[in-house]
Amino acid sequence: MALRCPIVSVLGHVDHGKTSLLDKIRKTRVTQREAGGITQHIGASEIPIDIIKKISKDLIKMLGANLTIPGILVIDTPGHAAFTSLRKRGGALADIAVLIVDINEGFMPQTIEALNILKQNKTPFVVAANKIDRLPGWSSVDGAFITNFNEQKQHPNALTEFEIKLYENVIAPLAERGFEADLFSRVKDVSKTINIVPISAMTGEGIPDLLVMISGLAQRFMEQNLKLNVEGYAKGTVLEVKEERGLGKTMDAIIYDGVAKRGDYIVIGNPDGIVVSRIKALLKPKALDEMRDPRDKFKTMNEISAATGLKISAPDLDNIIAGSPLRIVPKNMVEQAKAEIVEEIEETAIQLDEEGIIIKADTLGSLEALATELRKVGAKIKKAEVGDVSKKDVIEASSYAQTNPLNGAIILFNSKLLADAKSEVEKYEIKTFEGDIIYKLVEDYEEWTKEMKELLKSDEFNRLTKPAILRIIPGCIFNKTKPAICGVEVVYGTLRVGCSVVDEQGKRLGTVKEIKDKKQENIKEAKVGMEVPISIDGTVILGRHIGEDDIMYVELPEPEVRILSHNYMGELRGDEREAFERYVELKRKLENNPFWGI
């Protein structure tokens, strides 16, 4: 059975050389315009195996490799955002990835992000340790690294510096994250150890080694996945929809299996439903030397086989979302394709909660990745959509926050707040998190959640009735009733204005309306040991219902007793706990219910 090209994605931190590497790969041997040269697809570059064999012949001979794949298809858009956007059933579209790391700088936030995404998707990868040309004393060449890595070609100090940087900035950070890795020439078992290929995207050093490693690993471990269904219909993923001069609305896509034919029907899975449209044209870019007119950039194809990038001209392509699954089928298979796509969408659909936050992302794949990471930290998700944040989203978030303030948040990955939403965010005090690094967004959200919980806990605790036991001081009954005014000692706990007080039989005496200090000024609370005059509004008559030296308890509602008991015993002072325990003991005795307050 024929094999297709493995699909390769390049990930890594900003400025570590992703684009430079792709540019260098694309330029390899292109200037010679030889037969079988690198083909520029829509959104991808195909490097035929003949080119790889030619530029890497010495290395292939040294390794004894027998490469049978037709080549490799490198996704042109680098970075983890593109990687997460390009999905297929069962995971990432890319068969293998290149994680690029600046050997001089080491791991940075987006490196960690990329590694997390690869781990989550179980995508095999090689590490390209870039910028070796910047190592002190390193003599870089345009060719294989392995033949340049010796004492005949390099100064001993440069070799020592290389080993130090390789270990400290690449091997050790990978080990910290659970990956065994080593220089590719030292790896004995590629199924257990990550291959590190030193490269220079500037000089071209190590590019042959990298291409051979990618090809060899893909062929060895993914042969089953690379078997091409040459007779079958095409399966793919939407890259983007855009306007093309002379063509109108077109769609760029990556096809990873089967054959697409002109006149077939394209079936696309969209969050709003299945879109079906008949293909007017299958387009591929013309080679540079074929472009007589800049407006005439494409050539029409009758059929195109996987793996490939292509442009599709068809009606009704509005509102198609990047990352959406697609099928290209003859008319009699449209219903089957629709059913397949519905099943695929249901498999990957984000499970929403009854209450929670709103998340937004630029593509379906990004949205899935964001939701997955948020779930790991216990986030509840009420709404998950592709696109920017509108005024309607903010108003919805404010309504969610009414149920629980922790729901008043919107997380935006590669999305933005629309103009009409910005003022609403301020008006409704909705917390927003914006960024292009998922793990950083999740960390920030987690930190905010922690702070909010502490704040809410503090607010709830402060709203709860504080336990207290009071004694009426002899000679300090100043007014017997309406209001009853007397001096009390706070024996245990904290007495607050607004609480109800009961006697030792549990009978309510009234509500504490005022507490005064020694200067006869109103205060909000009195703590243990304080002697203060208080006024009680209620039916109590001092001297008849209760008298000097008698004990009063602050009345604690049973629901509040449960909350205090379960959540806040550690927040109570020792004397407050004493007041609480004595009151609960009294209530259980009076109610003849040992489970009161539990």
From Swiss-Prot:
On whether Membrane is a keyword of this UniProt record, the answer is no
NCBIfam families in UniProt: aIF-2, PRK04004.1, PRK14845.1, small_GTP
Q: Which family does it belong to?
A: Belongs to the TRAFAC class translation factor GTPase superfamily. Classic translation factor GTPase family. IF-2 subfamily.
Gene encoding it?
A: infB
Ranges where the tr-type G domain occurs:
3-223
Start and end residues of each stretch annotated as G4: 130-133
What organism does this protein naturally occur in? Methanococcus aeolicus (strain ATCC BAA-1280 / DSM 17508 / OCM 812 / Nankai-3)
Record's keyword terms, sorted:
GTP-binding, Initiation factor, Nucleotide-binding, Protein biosynthesis
Q: Outline the segment boundaries, as ranges, of region: G2.
A: 37-41
Alphabetical list of InterPro entries matching this protein: EFTU-type, P-loop_NTPase, Small_GTP-bd, T_Tr_GTP-bd_dom, TF_aIF-2_arc, TIF_IF2, TIF_IF2_dom3, TIF_IF2_dom3_sf
What's the protein called, per UniProt?
Answer: Probable translation initiation factor IF-2
SUPFAM superfamilies on file: Initiation factor IF2/eIF5b, domain 3, P-loop containing nucleoside triphosphate hydrolases, Translation proteins
What does this gene product do?
Function in general translation initiation by promoting the binding of the formylmethionine-tRNA to ribosomes. Seems to function along with eIF-2.
Q: Which residues bind GTP?
A: 12-19, 76-80, 130-133
Which residues does the annotated region (G1) include?
Answer: 12-19
A single Gene Ontology MF term assigned here is: GTP binding
Q: Does the keyword Cell division apply?
A: no
Q: Where is this region: G3?
A: 76-79
**Cellular compartments per GO CC:** cytoplasm
Query: CDD domains, alphabetically?
Result: aeIF5B_II, IF2_aeIF5B_IV, IF2_eIF5B
List every stretch annotated G5.
200-202
